[in-house]
Amino acid sequence: MSISQDDILNAVAEMSVLQVVELIKAFEEKFGVSAAAASAGPAVAAVAAEEQTEFNVMLLEAGEKKVNVIKAVRELTGLGLKEAKAVVDGAPAQVLEAVSKDAADKAKAVLEEAGAKVELK
């Protein structure tokens, strides 16, 4: 005996909401699937990237002017000499976390002027 798709849809249309929820749970258990909507993938990531309001400033490498980069890190973060040196020596390292676009751009400019390679995330 074969049941058509229309027969199934008509049967579901006659069910109460509670019965439909129970049917969905039964499908999930029987077939090992989830009724959750599939993620939209890269399109969602692109929208999120456009809406980003907070940035992390990442020091990728100090370059040849390490002393100037340490001074720039101290200026931007308020860290002591030892702590700033540890950040620079530990590159790649996060210099600033969750700052505005303007602050991140200014920090990047200061660090690059000092000779560092910098990335905003």
UniProtKB/Swiss-Prot annotation:
InterPro entries: Ribosomal_bL12, Ribosomal_bL12_C, Ribosomal_bL12_C/ClpS-like, Ribosomal_bL12_oligo, Ribosomal_bL12_oligo_N_sf. GO terms for molecular function: mRNA binding; structural constituent of ribosome. GO terms for biological process: translation. Pfam families: Ribosomal_L12 (PF00542), Ribosomal_L12_N (PF16320). One of its GO terms (cellular component) is cytosolic large ribosomal subunit. Keywords: Ribonucleoprotein, Ribosomal protein. Forms part of the ribosomal stalk which helps the ribosome interact with GTP-bound translation factors. Is thus essential for accurate translation. Homodimer. Part of the ribosomal stalk of the 50S ribosomal subunit. Forms a multimeric L10(L12)X complex, where L10 forms an elongated spine to which 2 to 4 L12 dimers bind in a sequential fashion. Binds GTP-bound translation factors. Belongs to the bacterial ribosomal protein bL12 family. PANTHER family: 39S RIBOSOMAL PROTEIN L12, LARGE RIBOSOMAL SUBUNIT PROTEIN BL12M. This is Large ribosomal subunit protein bL12. The gene is rplL.
